Amino acid sequence: MSDENNQPFFNIQRIYLKDMSLEQPNSPAIFLEQEMPSVEVEVDVKAERLADTVFEILVTGTVTAKVSDKVAFLIEAKQAGIFDIRNIPAEQIDPLVGIACPTILFPYLRSNIADAITRAGFPPIHLAEINFQALYEQRLAQIATQETGAGSAAHH
């Protein structure tokens, strides 16, 4: 085998909008409200191994806007990417799919959500940048806490 075949390889095969839904349960009355809506944003990352070196990474964004207790709109979008990752040490795969890949996908998700919100007749909402490194570390800490809790519960 040549050295070339053992070189670390990272390639984006495809980026696509996998799913999107928009609900406006209180339209058209909600458009007459004068109060500014409160906005809640949730982001989640999932990874699935499709083949030995191929992964689908999914970044899901959910935006809920409410005026008082009434939902103005709720939008959920799933931005996906297929990534070919080869000759990367096993311990580096998880951070790559949990940090680097979502960082690549997020601008597409943000753009699709902003576009859908304005097409729905609402003022644009631009999602802030997300620190996927911090999100990844937070997830690892949660897993460690759950495992510690499960381990101590088993000893009782």
UniProtKB/Swiss-Prot annotation:
<dbReference type="GO" id="GO:0051262">
    <property type="term" value="P:protein tetramerization"/>
</dbReference>
<keyword id="KW-0143">Chaperone</keyword>
<comment type="similarity">
    <text>Belongs to the SecB family.</text>
</comment>
<comment type="function">
    <text>One of the proteins required for the normal export of preproteins out of the cell cytoplasm. It is a molecular chaperone that binds to a subset of precursor proteins, maintaining them in a translocation-competent state. It also specifically binds to its receptor SecA.</text>
</comment>
<protein>
    <recommendedName>
        <fullName>Protein-export protein SecB</fullName>
    </recommendedName>
</protein>
<comment type="subunit">
    <text>Homotetramer, a dimer of dimers. One homotetramer interacts with 1 SecA dimer.</text>
</comment>
<dbReference type="GO" id="GO:0006457">
    <property type="term" value="P:protein folding"/>
</dbReference>
<keyword id="KW-0811">Translocation</keyword>
<dbReference type="GO" id="GO:0005737">
    <property type="term" value="C:cytoplasm"/>
</dbReference>
<dbReference type="GO" id="GO:0015031">
    <property type="term" value="P:protein transport"/>
</dbReference>
<dbReference type="GO" id="GO:0051082">
    <property type="term" value="F:unfolded protein binding"/>
</dbReference>
<keyword id="KW-0813">Transport</keyword>
<dbReference type="InterPro" id="IPR003708">
    <property type="entry name" value="SecB"/>
</dbReference>
<keyword id="KW-0963">Cytoplasm</keyword>
<dbReference type="Pfam" id="PF02556">
    <property type="entry name" value="SecB"/>
</dbReference>
<dbReference type="InterPro" id="IPR035958">
    <property type="entry name" value="SecB-like_sf"/>
</dbReference>
<keyword id="KW-0653">Protein transport</keyword>
